[in-house]
Regions:
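Glycine-aliphatic tripeptides that mark coil-to-beta-strand junctions in extracellular
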Residues: 27-29, 81-83, 137-141
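Loop/turn residues immediately N-terminal
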Residues: 38-39, 92-93, 148-149
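Hydrophobic beta-strand segments that make up the repeating blades of beta-propeller
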Residues: 31-35, 85-89, 141-145
């Protein structure tokens, strides 16, 4: 049975796509919510008794605008044991941010990793997911497309 109670007031705009991670390293899961306009909203979890609630921190996380249809994903794509933030868009663009752990005290300090996905021929649709599909120890990427097909990109470590 769906229970929207902890998410009352949490909106991302049209075509909301949530991703969950501990952004401020306080031990509670926070939300990044992508939307149709290409922006991502940042919500931090606050506890009210034993019920989680979320507070809007930023309407445009990292001042990011990926065009249309921001799809945030969290995955350790470079095997450094830190969560990377990968954002797909409806225009076939993927942006990658990696945390700068040495600068982060109580929060993730994200830095754009330019060119990480540039050599790939990405489809329009940009809804990536990451999983070790070939069981070789690194994360591969599957992207859902505007046409309804799925495209597989094997991570070869290059």
């Amino acid at each position: 049975i769906p229970n929207p109670t902890p998410f009352v007031g949490v909106t991302g705009g049209r075509n909301s796509v949530p991703s969950v991670l501990d952004l401020n390293q306080d031990g509670k899961m926070d939300l990044l919510v992508g939307n149709f306009l290409g922006h991502i909203r940042e919500y931090h979890q606050i506890l009210n008794g034993d019920t989680p609630h979320f507070k809007l921190e930023r309407r445009q996380f990292l001042n990011l605008d990926v065009g249309l249809g921001a799809v945030p994903r969290v995955a350790d794509i470079n095997n450094d044991s830190l969560p990377d933030l990968i954002i797909g868009s409806d225009r076939g663009r993927i942006v990658n941010f990696q945390p700068q752990q040495e600068k982060a005290v109580n929060a993730m300090n994200w830095k754009l990793k330019d060119g990480y996905f540039d050599k790939l021929d990405l489809p329009v649709g940009g809804s990536p997911v990451f999983e070790d599909m070939d069981f070789d120890g690194d994360l591969d990427m599957v992207i859902g497309t505007e046409k309804g097909t799925l495209v597989y990109f094997r991570n070869t470590g290059r």
